[in-house]
Amino acid sequence: HWTPRDVVELMADLVFMPIADKIKDASYSCYDGACGTGGMLTVAQDRLLTLAKRRGKEVAIHLFGQEINPETYAICTADMLLKGDGEEAEHIMYGSTLSDDQHASRQFDFMLSNPPYGKSWKTDAEKMGGKKEILDTRFNTYLEGGDAMPMIPRTSDGQLLFLLNNVAKMKKDTVLGSRIAEVHNG
């Protein structure tokens, strides 16, 4: 599926505008776990660089993504190679974010995504040992007492898992924390 450019720009505004005056001379990271051709990542990069420049700040933004479709993965990687020095392309991974998270140990400053909705994740569930056996802590929420509560949805639609994946990748001990903009079908 494809996200209209005006929607992507709105998402970037929602992520960056509330903290625009808090941007420091620093390096930031941006992630999309369903990156397709990488449009959200490049719009986010452009928006942050523009906001920083207007405020006299020197920033670097490093892009990270993962894509399961081989054609869109190839387009995204090629686009990153053409637009940059190749470093960004190294952070775009191929495979399923749900069952084979290639950025498992990372946390990000900003996350924008339009995950597939209405799409079965049954194959991913099977790769993770079956829906009832999934132990991946990304897909838990934690109750007030610290107890984990699995948030595993029906296998006919895995979009909630992409949101939980992003929440699990949020920075917890930084001044800005992390910010997420994600499109869902309602």
Predicted regions and their residues:
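Compositionally biased, intrinsically disordered/low-complexity regions enriched for serine, proline
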Residues: H1, L112-S113, D147-P150
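Conserved Class I SAM-dependent methyltransferase catalytic core
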Residues: Y73, T77, G145-G186
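Short linear sequence motifs
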Residues: F110, K132-L135, T155
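Flexible, active-site-adjacent loop/turn segments at secondary-structure boundaries
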Residues: S96, P115, K119, T137, ...
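A mobile, often basic/glycine-rich helix-loop segment
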Residues: K122-A148
